[in-house]
């Protein structure tokens, strides 16, 4: 009966017969909730560490991907510039070939003219020798 009167007043005895303000069942639930909260906070901390590691890994991979992308862009630009240089060199060589062909044709015409002059001079010399 004394327990009932104390219970109505909000006072309770625990298993060690100590006077408590809270009901022992509520106290037990509070302790369990506190432990669950601690476990939850620990798990959240672990989760944050894992997520932080994943974020760092993703950032690192993103940086590596960006570096590779820049290397690829650089290589592509280098290939384009090499192609343009080769095209310019090819045009220069074609112009040089055309110039050399023109020069060759000029030399051929000059050679034919000189051969004709030589033949005329030889004929003149032959006529001069036979006349004497």
Curated annotation (Swiss-Prot):
InterPro entries: FT20 (IPR028172). The keyword Glycosyltransferase does not apply. Part of intraflagellar transport (IFT) particles involved in ciliary process assembly. May play a role in the trafficking of ciliary membrane proteins from the Golgi complex to the cilium. Regulates the ciliary platelet-derived growth factor receptor-alpha (PDGFRA) signaling pathway. Required for protein stability of E3 ubiquitin ligases CBL and CBLB that mediate ubiquitination and internalization of PDGFRA for proper feedback inhibition of PDGFRA signaling. Essential for male fertility. Plays an important role in spermatogenesis, particularly spermiogenesis, when germ cells form flagella. It comes from Mus musculus (Mouse). GO terms for molecular function: opsin binding; small GTPase binding. One of its GO terms (biological process) is intraciliary transport. Residues 74-116 form a coiled coil. This is Intraflagellar transport protein 20 homolog. Keywords: Cell projection, Cilium, Cilium biogenesis/degradation, Coiled coil, Cytoplasm, Cytoplasmic vesicle, Cytoskeleton, Differentiation, Golgi apparatus, Spermatogenesis. Expressed predominantly in the testis (at protein level). Expressed in kidney and retina. Expression is up-regulated during spermiogenesis. The lineage of its organism: Eukaryota, Metazoa, Chordata, Craniata, Vertebrata. Pfam families: IFT20. GO terms for cellular component: acrosomal vesicle; centriole; centrosome; ciliary basal body; ciliary base; cilium; cis-Golgi network; cytoplasm. It is found in: Golgi apparatus, cis-Golgi network; Cytoplasm, Cytoskeleton, Microtubule organizing center, Centrosome, Centriole; Cytoplasm, Cytoskeleton, Cilium basal body; Cell projection, Cilium. It comes from the Eukaryota.
């Amino acid at each position: 009966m004394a327990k009932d009167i104390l219970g109505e007043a909000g006072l309770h005895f625990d298993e060690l017969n100590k006077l408590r303000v809270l009901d022992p069942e509520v106290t037990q639930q509070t302790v369990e909730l506190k432990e669950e909260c601690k476990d939850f906070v620990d798990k959240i901390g672990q989760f944050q560490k894992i997520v932080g590691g994943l974020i760092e890994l993703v950032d690192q991979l993103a940086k590596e991907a960006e570096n590779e992308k820049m290397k690829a862009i650089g290589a592509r630009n280098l290939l384009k510039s090499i192609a343009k240089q080769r095209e310019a060199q090819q045009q220069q060589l074609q112009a040089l070939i055309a110039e050399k062909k023109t020069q060759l044709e000029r030399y051929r015409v000059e050679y034919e003219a000189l051969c004709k002059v030589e033949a005329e001079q030889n004929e003149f010399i032959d006529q001069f020798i036979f006349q004497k």
